[in-house]
Amino acid sequence: MTDFYPHVYLSPHLDDAVLSCGGLIHQQGVAGQRPLVITLFAGHPPAEELSAFVQSLHARWGDPVNVVATRRAEDQAALAVLGADYLRLDYPDCIYRGRGHTGELYYTSSEALFGPVHPADAGLPAELATTLTELIPPGDGVTLYAPLTVGNHVDHRLTLSLIHI
């Protein structure tokens, strides 16, 4: 990335930064400070059949077929109103992660979303940190914002832990 952004928000999911820091992002945007929101877990679901748990979440979110595309469009519109740029990484939300050689999904219930991080996700913060360092080289003048993990969601905890690497 060639542009300089003095304020970079790490948003675990689409809408997290907007909902938690929207006021500050807007202040920075109208002041011409060019905030950037990087959404880490904004990837599309896998092509294979979705679990019953994921299907129930998609139905609750109101668009069982195109939920990620709909959420991306909503997030993009909200960030435009706030005056922020955005970048999306293609890591999937925890509800889609897993399968691999065992066929196991890592997070298959509401309780699991707020429980322990699956052992297979243990290396994810380091991988994300490497990706982010390539996108935004460390340097003076950049303030990085990360979630406080209120609520204890797995993806929020993974996002916070990557800044301690």
Spans of model-derived segments:
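Active-site histidine-anchored catalytic micro-motif
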Residues: 18-27, 147, 153-156, 160-161
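Active-site rim/loop-helix segments in enzyme catalytic domains that contact anionic ligands
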Residues: 1-121, 125, 129-139
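Proline-aspartate-enriched helix->loop->beta-strand connector
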Residues: 84, 141-145, 149
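Conserved small/polar residues in nucleotide/adenosyl-binding loops
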Residues: 164-165
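Short, well-ordered beta-to-alpha junction loops that form the rim of enzyme active sites
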Residues: 12, 89-92, 146-156
